[in-house]
Amino acid sequence: MPVDPVACEGCGFLWAEVEPDDAPGRLAAAVAAFIEQLEVAGDAGLLRPSPERWSIVEYTGHLRDALLSMRERIIVASVTELPTGTPIYREERIELGFARLDTPAEVAVELEVATGLLLKTMLTLPDGFHDRPLIYSSNFSSPTTIAWVIAQAVHEAEHHLGDVAENGRLRRG
């Protein structure tokens, strides 16, 4: 994932079209729809539709972890000069079994909490802080901004909402 792409190849998301004032509403709406997909799936949300595709619960846990990580990146970039974020090791978390105890009900609550914390951070960000620079993670060399991280949070939620909706379609046949 480049730090400043024009559009996501997978979902068509355009980072430049996310205004910081619109981001909280878009994030909240995507997460609400995400949780609805999780609730509709029930225990079937624990099942992978194929070995190479995550389950709905795994996607939900990934989004939870990504939002928590982005919140920390925003806070650190607000208080230090050009910090470098830590990768979240998304694939490794799954491969090492860190999601195996997640249940649909618990991961839904955890996603709601993570979203609420990030939304509070977005809504209380001091004026002028959207342009503060940071290195998104050690996997990237170019600086980006807090505004981009906020847009990326929206992208994560909207993109993976598409993934869980597809899982639902695959489950229903």
Where are these regions (language model features)?
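Short acidic/polar alpha-helix capping motifs at helix-coil junctions
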Residues: A7-G12, D22-A23, Q37-E39, L82, ...
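Hydrophobic alpha-helical segments and helix-packing faces
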Residues: P20, L27, E52-I56, L63, ...
